[in-house]
UniProtKB/Swiss-Prot annotation:
Keyword Cell cycle: no
The species this protein was found in: Mus musculus (Mouse)
Induction (record text): By TNF in fibroblasts.
Gene knockout outcome: When infected with lymphocytic choriomeningitis virus (LCMV), TIPE2-deficient mice exhibit significantly enhanced CD4(+) and CD8(+) T-cell immune responses compared with WT mice. TIPE2-deficient NK-cells exhibit enhanced activation, cytotoxicity, and IFN-gamma production upon stimulation and enhanced response to IL-15 for maturation.
One biological process term in Gene Ontology: negative regulation of T cell activation
Protein's name according to its UniProt entry: Tumor necrosis factor alpha-induced protein 8-like protein 2
InterPro entries linked: TNFAIP8-like (IPR008477), TNFAIP8_sf (IPR038355)
Compartments where located: Cytoplasm; Nucleus; Lysosome
Length: 184
């Protein structure tokens, strides 16, 4: 007998539709104003660091696609108990990374690229484990692309260097607000 699930089909269609529409309008359904401002600053950092508008756009587009897909999976109740524990671990690790990034930004001479890069790599690995059975290999590649880009020690060193002070300040302001509001 053929196995058919309209819920599964609807979820596939939703993910497919969202993957085609990872622009600003769809992102605002899942990403609040503060998060959007942080993403805009991350885009500017990537653009200035890589000297490539298309590369910076690709990273942010991949980040938004992944965030939206994970949000859809979570809101649709697709994660089992073990996966929900992984989701909690991911959120805790992401929060730890945000607090570390803030600390490095606020306290002079404390920045260590290896520490922040390590936290981002841990986040990547937890997220990949979380979505292993729910997203396609292409989405897994997007996750790797985003986290590998932002965990690059050279990019992190540039971000915490004198040329990116303004961007870092805005990113830290956004992270602080997200942490204070319990959104991160």
């Amino acid at each position: 007998m053929e196995s058919f699930s309209s819920k599964s089909l609807a979820l596939q269609a939703e993910k497919k539709l969202l993957s085609k529409m990872a622009g600003r309008s769809v992102a605002h359904l899942f990403i609040d104003e503060t998060s959007s401002e942080v993403l805009d600053e991350l885009y500017r950092v990537s653009k200035e660091y890589t000297h490539s508008r298309p590369k910076a756009q690709r990273v942010i587009k991949d980040l938004i696609k992944v965030a939206v897909k994970v949000a859809v999976l979570h809101r649709s109740g697709c994660f089992g108990p073990g996966e929900l524990a992984l989701a909690t671990r991911f959120r805790q690790k992401l929060r730890q990374g945000a607090m570390t990034a803030l600390s490095f930004g606020e306290v002079d001479f404390t920045f260590e690229a290896a520490v922040l890069a390590g936290l981002l790599v841990e986040c990547r690995d937890i997220l990949l484990e979380l979505v292993e059975h729910h997203l396609t290999p292409k989405s897994h590649d997007r996750i790797r692309h985003v986290f590998d880009h932002y965990s690059d020690p050279d990019l992190l060193a540039a971000l915490y260097g004198p040329d990116f002070t303004q961007h870092l300040g805005k990113i830290c302001d956004g992270l602080r607000k997200l942490l204070d509001e319990g959104k991160l």
